């Protein structure tokens, strides 16, 4: 009786993108192409490239914070700061829910967890191209969520913010949301004015997508 030989050829377990993930990737490419971008990771200027890399680290910090503390965490991007308008669309912070004496999260009672960063000079968060769901493309998705005030903030950080949120398991509450930044200029005489794109910066955009599991 012949002994049956089993095929021991290792089977690759690597999985490709799911259909949903592919749709999201295509959506982000559409957004960045509309913005004049030439790549997903800011292949234009060094300022945009470094801004994307540093911001990704803040998103990872917020996600890990949410998991470790079992409390919601948010990445904030300044929309309209009361005392430092020159940092609008450039100041990025990380906040999380406070914990009570038993180590449990106090719902919607936020505290600053990181001083975050300022985007590089002449680099700004793009309200136009950052979307709540990148799979819907430039026109089909709603804007990023907003936080009208930052409770208990020091004077430097008072104002309104855009935000991306992670739940207690580190899952992004707006899966497929895109984060896009680009080069621009703002009139020195009006620091709170909306930045504008200059001719040399039309292709200088970059960004990433926040997947459902919180990774970028």
Over which residues does each language-model region extend?
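N-terminal helix-rich module
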Residues: 2-7, 14-20, 34-64, 68, ...
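Residues within membrane-spanning alpha-helices of integral membrane proteins
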Residues: 27-28
